């Protein structure tokens, strides 16, 4: 009996606590909903809202900047305009007007080129390249402007950078000429080789002539001969290249044919070598090298008589090839006379008489 009463009391307590908890939760929820209903919107400052509405959009520059930019852009003098725009960019490095300032330079450079104001063009192009180092138009403008004003050091500085971006025979020719003026033979040769194949023989002549000396000095006979042949092809008999006197041109032809002959000889084309050396002697009879190699060619052709005469003439001139010519002459003569030199003096006397 007591157990039933105890169980009844426990159940009653659970019901009471459950009701209280449920009622408490319900009351809290109602209070929260009431707070939400009573919450008022935040007040709006009408004056601040009006200011915000009238605020100008951010264009990336001030009115003062714009006026300064327009003043520079509208300068009638192209040099002053470029200087003004450059100064604006330096003064306002973050201004959105800088893009417009930069875009004005190509027009300025083109107008200076059309006006043939190369001194100003060089200055403007060089200044622009400080701001935009890889600009193709500015590189080309600087190259041509400084070449025109004979500032060859700057011409090659900007010209080589331009050639990397826009290679052409015309640019190579300008660089070759500039390096020639700067006495930089290696660079001259490099760019001359690039432009000559695209030029006609007469236009290429000055470059071919200089290259013939360049390679001959370095004992590169094949290349020297190649350019000598181009020289000889440029002007016919009776013609004289610009800048040459007739006497100098005669000497040049003698030298060129001698180099051509030497190249044929080293390639064992002895018949062609004889023709080239005879051409050289036509313009310069005192060419000891020509007589010596003619002797060697005739020896190879088993024409011993003509070979001995040629060696004798080379010896009689008393020039650098004389000693070698005498040695070759004696060797050949001994082969023909059982090791004896008896009678060789007669050949030498005849050769000496013919050379007078």
Model-flagged regions — what are they?
Residues 101-107, 141, 174, 210, ...:
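Canonical tetratricopeptide repeat
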Residues 112-115, 149, 182, 218, ...:
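Structural motif corresponding to the intra-repeat A-B loop/turn of tetratricopeptide repeats
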Residues 23-119, 123, 345, 353-356:
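N-terminal leader/linker segments that initiate helical-solenoid repeat arrays
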Residues 107-110, 144, 177, 209-213, ...:
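Residue-level recognition of tetratricopeptide repeat
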Residues 65, 99-102, 136-137, 169-170, ...:
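Helix-start (N-cap) detector for alpha-helical repeat units in TPR-like alpha-solenoids
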Residues 242, 247-254, 266, 313-356:
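Terminal, low-structured helical/coil segments at or just beyond the last alpha-helical repeat
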Residues 164, 226-236, 299-323, 330-334, ...:
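TPR/TPR-like (Sel1-like) alpha-helical repeat modules
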């Amino acid at each position: 009996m007591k157990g039933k009463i105890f169980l009844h009391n426990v159940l009653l307590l659970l019901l009471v606590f459950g009701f209280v908890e449920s009622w408490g939760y319900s009351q809290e929820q109602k209070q929260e909903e009431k707070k939400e209903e009573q919450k008022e919107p935040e007040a709006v400052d009408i004056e601040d809202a009006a200011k915000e509405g009238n605020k100008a959009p951010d264009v990336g520059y001030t009115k003062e900047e714009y006026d300064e930019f327009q003043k520079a852009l509208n300068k009638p003098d192209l040099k002053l305009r470029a200087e003004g725009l450059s100064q604006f960019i330096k003064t306002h490095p973050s201004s959105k007007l800088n893009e417009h300032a930069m875009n004005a330079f190509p027009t300025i450079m083109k107008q200076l080129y059309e006006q043939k104001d190369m001194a100003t063009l060089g200055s403007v192009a060089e200044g622009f390249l400080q701001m935009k180092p890889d600009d193709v138009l500015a590189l080309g403008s600087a190259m041509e402007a400084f070449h025109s004003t004979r500032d060859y050091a700057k011409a090659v500085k900007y010209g080589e950078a331009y050639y990397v971006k826009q290679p052409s025979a015309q640019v190579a020719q300008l660089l070759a000429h500039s390096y020639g003026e700067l006495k930089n033979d290696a660079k001259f040769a490099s760019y001359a080789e690039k432009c000559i194949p695209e030029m006609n023989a007469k236009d290429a002549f000055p470059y071919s002539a200089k290259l013939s000396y360049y390679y001959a000095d370095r004992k590169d006979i094949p290349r020297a001969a190649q350019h000598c042949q181009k020289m000889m092809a440029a002007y016919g008999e009776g013609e004289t290249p610009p800048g040459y006197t007739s006497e100098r041109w005669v000497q040049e032809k003698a030298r060129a044919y001698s180099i051509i002959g030497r190249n044929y000889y080293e390639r064992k084309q002895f018949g062609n070598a004889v023709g080239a050396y005879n051409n050289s002697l036509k313009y310069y009879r005192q060419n000891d090298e020509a007589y010596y190699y003619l002797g060697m060619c005739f020896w190879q052709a088993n024409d011993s008589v003509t070979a001995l005469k040629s060696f004798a003439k080379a010896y009689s001139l008393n020039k650098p090839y004389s000693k070698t010519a005498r040695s070759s002459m004696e060797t050949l003569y001994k082969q023909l006379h059982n090791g004896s030199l008896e009678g060789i003096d007669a050949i030498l006397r005849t050769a000496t008489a013919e050379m007078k």
